[in-house]
Swiss-Prot record:
Subunit-level organization: Homodimer.
GO biological process, one term: protein refolding
Family under the similarity heading: Belongs to the DnaJ family.
Highest taxon, organism lineage: Bacteria
Domain remark from Swiss-Prot or TrEMBL: The J domain is necessary and sufficient to stimulate DnaK ATPase activity. Zinc center 1 plays an important role in the autonomous, DnaK-independent chaperone activity of DnaJ. Zinc center 2 is essential for interaction with DnaK and for DnaJ activity.
Name of the featured protein: Chaperone protein DnaJ
Zinc finger (CR-type): 133-215
Function of the protein: Participates actively in the response to hyperosmotic and heat shock by preventing the aggregation of stress-denatured proteins and by disaggregating proteins, also in an autonomous, DnaK-independent fashion. Unfolded proteins bind initially to DnaJ; upon interaction with the DnaJ-bound protein, DnaK hydrolyzes its bound ATP, resulting in the formation of a stable complex. GrpE releases ADP from DnaK; ATP binding to DnaK triggers the release of the substrate protein, thus completing the reaction cycle.
Keywords, ordered alphabetically: Chaperone, Cytoplasm, DNA replication, Metal-binding, Repeat, Stress response, Zinc, Zinc-finger
Species: Prochlorococcus marinus (strain MIT 9313)
One GO location term (cellular component): cytoplasm
NCBIfam families hit by this protein: DnaJ_bact, PRK10767.1, PRK14293.1
Binding annotation for Zn(2+) 1: 146, 149, 203, 206
Length: 378
């Protein structure tokens, strides 16, 4: 679907009155009972959907941040396709109710305190930050209660008053005649938009909405042991509520960047290290990379290719219990030489002859690394 602002032909900072005027004009133009073009009905539905989203501060805030994906089929959004023909035509021309009333009547908006929406923030962190945790500063766009009017939406010194059109109930009834008979339709009050109150003198700072969109700096604590997909909840840092309602929460979804040498399997760290055939045969002590930095690892004499050695307590801290840590498992890659010097070849041939002289029944290295070095079969 096209951008909602483009559908209504308004700018992204358009106020409520501008949106309403644009919607009424386009609803008259594309109403399927008037406009018989094949695409008129679909366009009429799109216009209605755009107005429903942008006329509500909460859904407008989500749309501005995340687009159509941020709406997620929000419950309570009326389906413009359910609008009745002649009744809607009456509303469109006389009251501007189009898109608000379904075939069974309008659903009133909640007039009391309304909790703000929860927000999502995606954050990428380094491998080491996921292991040991860190405090990070982020900037989030969200709705805050207008500090000029304290969320009332009214200019300082004034306040909301009971809507004279609906008497404060948020709904109006209209009787009309059609070729099919007379009927009464209940619809959202066009004057107060279902709230039961009107603001004659709106706050200039928030255009009467009671909330303003701002970018806020937050410092969040990333605990040790998090992983990709971990969700952190920051209470009260979502969008501000309406009419004194509580704010929603902020949910931070983490993605952990890969490490050039280390991999993760739960709380176990996996890595590989290359050793020479002489180190594998004779044993050695080498330096390996761990999340704690370089650490000494003992290569036992006679280590076979693809052997796995373990460094205890060098893995990932357990989320919620950072004292408990996993292990690091290191796969050993034994590198055999492609080319040998004459001296090396002579020594190896001498060693191979020494082992052959002992006889196969006494040969303890007739498989694995020695077999590969001396061309023997196990």
């Amino acid at each position: 679907m096209a951008d909602y602002y483009d559908l209504l032909g308004v700018s992204k900072d358009a106020d409520g009155d501008t949106l309403k005027r644009a919607y009424r004009r386009l609803a008259r133009q594309y109403h399927p009972d008037i406009n018989k073009d094949p695409g008129a009905e679909d366009r009429f539905k799109e216009i209605g959907r755009a107005y429903e989203v942008l006329s509500d501060p909460q859904t407008r805030g989500r749309y501005d941040q995340f687009g159509e994906a941020g709406l997620g089929g929000a419950a309570g959004m009326p389906d413009v396709g359910d609008m009745g023909g002649f009744a809607d035509l009456f509303e469109t021309f006389f009251s501007g109710f189009g898109g608000a009333g379904g075939s069974g009547g309008a659903r009133p908006r909640r007039r009391g305190p309304q909790q703000g929406d929860d927000l999502r923030y995606d954050l990428k962190i380094d491998f080491e930050q996921a292991v040991f945790g860190q405090e990070r500063e982020i900037k989030i766009p969200h709705l805050e209660t207008c500090d000029t009017c304290n969320g009332t939406g009214a200019k300082v010194g004034s306040g909301p008053t009971t809507c004279s059109t609906c008497g404060g109930v948020g709904q109006v009834r209209r009787a009309t005649r059609t070729p099919f008979g007379s009927f009464t339709q209940v619809a959202e009050c066009p004057s107060c938009e279902g709230t039961g109150q009107v603001i004659a003198d709106p706050c200039p700072a928030c255009a009467g909405q009671g909330v303003r969109q701002v970018r806020k700096k937050l410092r969040i604590n990333i605990p040790a042991g998090v992983d990709t997909g971990t969700r952190l909840r920051v209470a009260g840092e979502g969008n501000a509520g309406l009419r004194g309602g509580p704010s929603g929460d902020l949910y931070v979804f983490l993605t952990v960047k890969s490490h050039p040498q280390l991999r993760r399997d739960g709380i176990t760290v996996l890595s590989e290290v290359n050793v020479s055939y002489l180190q594998a045969i004779l044993g050695d002590i080498i330096e390996v990379d761990t999340v704690d930095g370089n650490t000494s690892l003992e290569i036992p004499a006679g280590t076979q290719p693809n052997a796995v050695l373990t460094l205890e307590n060098k893995g990932i801290p357990k989320l919620g219990n950072p004292v408990a840590r996993g292990n690091q498992r290191i796969s050993i890659n034994v590198k055999l030489p492609i080319r040998l010097s004459d001296e090396e070849r002579g020594l190896l041939e001498e060693l191979a002859g020494h082992h052959s002289a002992k006889g196969r029944q006494h040969h303890h290295h007739n498989s694995g690394l020695f077999a590969r070095l001396f061309g023997q079969k196990g």
